[in-house]
């Protein structure tokens, strides 16, 4: 039996709270069960040097975990003087995922940075970050439309993400920490609302997985992402 008696295809309870902080152009507290991430969007009228004069914008992301977001305290990466490889990998994943939902030409020469700060971790922090940051990004862009900065909406569609895996021989979606740490196969899937996939990250931690198991996991991920899209749309009032 899974934690909280969930079915194998059942994500954790998803809660998305918009306008969580007052200064950022977009701010969201996203909760996947006991995993909680604060996602904020910052708009700047400048682009990275490699994009200057090209008439297009940029979307990037940063990711971090608070010291006591986990069972025992982690040292802040700022105190270490450098980011870890896991952090850099995750924030690049978040940024790639969010750029897929935006027409960068229509955004114009401005940059939007999504900061994803994990308040409490219980598995799936990167997928929760993508899900919450997508809503914060929508809010930031809606603000640009409302104040007349943008004439057309550059959002091409929502993006969501979920973890799937094989635990005790069973394919399951949205793994909690106790499941993730025991998974024979662990996979993260990022999808557009139209069903196209942005990223699939899968690893066999023990026995290799079969082609049939891969297809089963992808189907579970699609089901889970579709439920997340519903939560995102409800949060945005769409």
UniProtKB/Swiss-Prot annotation:
Its EC number is 2.7.7.56. Keywords: Nucleotidyltransferase, RNA-binding, rRNA processing, Transferase, tRNA processing, tRNA-binding. This is Ribonuclease PH. It catalyses: tRNA(n+1) + phosphate = tRNA(n) + a ribonucleoside 5'-diphosphate. Phosphorolytic 3'-5' exoribonuclease that plays an important role in tRNA 3'-end maturation. Removes nucleotide residues following the 3'-CCA terminus of tRNAs; can also add nucleotides to the ends of RNA molecules by using nucleoside diphosphates as substrates, but this may not be physiologically important. Probably plays a role in initiation of 16S rRNA degradation (leading to ribosome degradation) during starvation. It is an enzyme of class 2 (transferase). It comes from the Bacteria. The keyword RNA-binding applies. GO terms for molecular function: 3'-5'-RNA exonuclease activity; RNA binding; tRNA binding; tRNA nucleotidyltransferase activity. Homohexameric ring arranged as a trimer of dimers. PANTHER family: EXOSOME COMPLEX COMPONENT, EXOSOME COMPLEX COMPONENT RRP41. Gene3D superfamilies: GHMP Kinase, N-terminal domain (3.30.230.70). GO terms for biological process: rRNA catabolic process; rRNA processing; tRNA processing. HAMAP family: RNase_PH. The gene is rph. Coiled coil: none annotated. Phosphate binds at residues 86, 124-126. Belongs to the RNase PH family. It comes from Haemophilus influenzae (strain ATCC 51907 / DSM 11121 / KW20 / Rd). Signal peptide: none annotated.
């Amino acid at each position: 039996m899974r934690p909280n008696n969930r079915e194998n295809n059942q994500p954790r309870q998803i809660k998305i709270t918009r306008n969580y902080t007052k200064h950022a152009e977009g701010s969201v507290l996203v909760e996947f069960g006991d995993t909680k991430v604060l996602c904020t969007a910052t708009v700047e009228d400048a682009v990275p040097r490699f994009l200057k004069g090209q008439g297009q914008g940029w979307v990037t992301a940063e990711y971090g975990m608070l010291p006591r977001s986990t069972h025992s305290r982690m040292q802040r990466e700022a105190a270490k003087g450098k980011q870890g490889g896991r952090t850099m990998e995750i924030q690049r994943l978040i940024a790639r995922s969010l750029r897929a939902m935006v027409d960068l030409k229509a955004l114009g020469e401005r940059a939007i940075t999504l900061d994803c700060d994990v308040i409490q971790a219980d598995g799936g922090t990167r997928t929760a970050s993508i899900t919450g940051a997508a809503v914060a990004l929508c809010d930031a862009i809606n603000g640009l439309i409302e104040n007349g900065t943008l004439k057309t909406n550059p959002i091409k569609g929502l993006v969501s993400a979920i973890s799937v895996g094989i635990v005790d021989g069973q394919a399951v979606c949205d793994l909690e920490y106790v499941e993730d740490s025991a998974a024979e196969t662990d996979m993260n899937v990022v999808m557009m609302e139209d069903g196209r996939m942005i990223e699939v990250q899968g690893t066999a931690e023990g026995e290799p997985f079969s082609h049939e198991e891969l297809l089963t996991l992808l189907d579970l991920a699609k089901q889970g992402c579709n439920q997340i899209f519903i939560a995102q749309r409800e949060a945005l009032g769409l």
